């Protein structure tokens, strides 16, 4: 599952950490003051490069609440668990309650550990001290979006998933061992008036039903301005790769009307998690009709897709979400690069920065018409073995990444489209003078509906997919050389996306993306994507952002997995 995200203004991004701690510490009453620059364009470049604002210098003794804020949001000196626990001692009972209110996941864990639905401030503080600072920060990472919990935390407590507060240096592997004979042969009963169905996505009328459900009731941003608009072509590409099973396309219909009112899907994937290869069900496209959101269908759908996977001997699951659940393997942040800034501005997707004008933004994000890399061309089927080889060698650098067969590589990088069908993915290779494939990159298309916009119906969005380059595979790793090559490749990818009338180019902070996001004028978004493994414990994997939720170019990311 992807997450809808929009760019945030630089000044908003700059103070993001402070806003996350707003229930604990009051913001500095004196507003930041920015010096006026000679030209707005210079002001924007300087602001983007430095990402900071000058504050009036004022010496004062730090309050206990300020210390807690620093322990939570980061400061000049990196906080430790001891710093955080010491700061907790200075919180008032009200502040402890406000802190827990920032994250329902943490609140639920505290309630469970204290055996109380309404633990006292002392009980809550004691429970929090048993958690690591990393767990606390993971819980706060979604920036307030956790109010919309996916399902119930009581449900997740019964499932084989890691819990908050566990040691981060545990042996990796399955949490629960089962046998197929132990799996229920029939699904759980639904509430009266609803029935299970298996959707046949090879039938036009049924994939249209799934499309319409997702188009009206799938993921949207917090302000309900944008919602994913997956076309039937994209849905087939995402849900019908080699090895797909009809039984993994699970629906719920209203018994009387036959209306499809809920859906969940899964595809098989061979996932390398550090040194182990795990066969997983990659769960995606969980959608429930808005009128049924209070019927607690989410846990029921998850249990059913789990049951069907278990019947095939698949015991692990892979999923992503924009909310914090117990317990993320990693957390990445969305970044956005405007291609058609004017349209994005008119849709309310891209803000107009302070002290700027639309024409400056259009000029800032302008791209040339022609690509620059010699030997760059679209992928052909004859290239697939070379691309597979480069993909697997490059992805050895990451901790969690899918392994692909030739058939899977063809499907994901070079899918066949019929007459009138929308193209799902664009893949390009670089062929040198010796006819060797030295680089490749790919991106896929998902449109977003601009809800209630009178001027534009959809935003055409490109999502960075997989890439690889020989520059990153030299005997002596040269990060500077890799950074330059990735910037060259992605710049050409942006030009190609412009050629195909995309409006914005999105990327997460996974893989080596932190090396090119800033230079290619990607702006930080307000969306996070958390990666989860079901029935498999894995120690945390870097997500490409630091504790302040800023790009971590030094450590990069261990996530080498992109889910449409």
UniProtKB/Swiss-Prot annotation:
Database matches in InterPro entries: Acyl_CoA_acyltransferase, NMT, NMT_C, NMT_CS, NMT_N
Keywords, sorted A to Z: Acyltransferase, Cytoplasm, Transferase
List of catalytic residues: 564
Ranges of compositional bias, category Basic and acidic residues: 45-54
Cellular compartments annotated: Cytoplasm
Major place of residence: cytoplasm
The enzyme's E.C. designation: 2.3.1.97
Keyword Cytoplasm in record: yes
Function description: Adds a myristoyl group to the N-terminal glycine residue of certain cellular proteins.
Family: Belongs to the NMT family.
Protein name as annotated: Glycylpeptide N-tetradecanoyltransferase
Gene name of the record: NMT1
